[in-house]
Amino acid sequence: MSLMKSVVLIFASLAVNIAYSAETNPSIQNYWSIAEQKKLDQDITWQRLMYANKNQKSEVTYAGYFLSENGKNNLKEELKADISALFIPTQDNQSIRCKFPARSQWLIQQLGIQENELPQVKCSEFENWIGQIKPYKATLIYATDFMGNPSSMFGHTLLRLDPKDQQQLNLVSYAVNYAATVAGNDNWSYAWKGLTGQYPGEYSLMPYYRKVKEYGDFESRDLWEYELNLSPEETRFLVSHIWEMQHVSFPYYFVSDNCAYRLLGLVDLVKPESHLQEKFNYASIPMETIKAMQQQGLTKAPVYRPALETQLLAQAHQHGASLAKVAHQLAMKPIKDSSETLKSFSPSDQAKILEMAYDDLYLQFIGRKVEESFAQPQLRQLLALRSQIDLDKQRQEPKRPSTEPTQGHNARNVSLKLGEVQGDKFIEIGHRQAYHDLIDPQGGYRAGTQLL
């Protein structure tokens, strides 16, 4: 069970009447007046915290997200209710400051409320949760396209949250993923439901290594990691807001309101001057959203994390086709036969063969091409043979692609073609929202993904 899912919040209504509290507490009325003067209900950050649409109503349908009975439809009423709630004593973990820490922090800062004016609160559930994450910086992860899933045909983005000084251990950092929640077996209608918003999109939190294994091992997708130019304070505020969203879902659309679109909203929240989501009202292609962030100086140079299959292919290229062929055969041979085969090779070549054989068999195993009863003991025995060779690993890191994904051509395309076929002249006007075809430059895209 994920860390986020293991947290249980009781969204009970506050055991007081907010209107009555405002009448008996002059501070509340004073801060209402300040909020009115500053027009906080129109502030871009409040609008984004409330997921306000063009009609000034919230997109959120979960009633527990609002303290005012009419908060969804009247964001000004919700603002007043939230200000009042700050001054109401509650049981542990029930304060607005525990349930909505980002919202509360913003209100306290905007109104200049002093800590000694507020009742003491204990938010052990939230503090334990964020204490495990220790957010200090955020990195946007781009997983290249995966043709085996309609929701991932254009790639996928998620967010990794790194503690301070954990550059070498970021696999154990937590990752925030926004994805469609699919219940049951919907194979026949999956694409249609995803295109028409019939699945709920929800945030989830899990260790980053799980996503690396899923994308890099199981689905053979290279990862590109773009650290965001966010301060530690902005990163913590973003994560505090994710806590607020754990019971909230939105209709998930594969092409428009998808993973990339919602992650843009998180960046917009902590960067009020950015208006990233507004640029993607119709189609949110993950790589195009990263380009938009890059244009605003929000990303740093990416780190390339090749998939396991990419690594194996690179080894085969580096070590030569003949050794790669032996490794492929060795992966499926009984170990006693393997020992005889290896004798005709130098220790260096033996190490290369065994390393490739291990990776080859592991890829077949996770791809369900071989049975576990064979694969597990065979993998252990291949490792044992390799450990007997006193040489450092022979694997070399795959060569980084010369063109990064953000340097590839834009996804959207309008074309005008003139030509002649068997004496018949033609004019063709075309429009494409995403992907590329055979006449587009290959740089930044995986080989073999052209539309025909």
Model-derived features: positions:
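N-terminal accessory/precursor segments of enzymes
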Residues: 188-260, 270
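Glycine-rich catalytic cores of cysteine/serine-nucleophile enzymes that process amide/ester linkages
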Residues: 134-218, 431
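Bacterial N-terminal signal peptides
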Residues: 6-17
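Gly/Pro-rich turn-and-neighbor structural signature
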Residues: 97, 102-148, 153-160, 271
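Short loop/turn motifs that connect adjacent beta-strands in outer-membrane beta-barrel proteins
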Residues: 404-410, 438-451
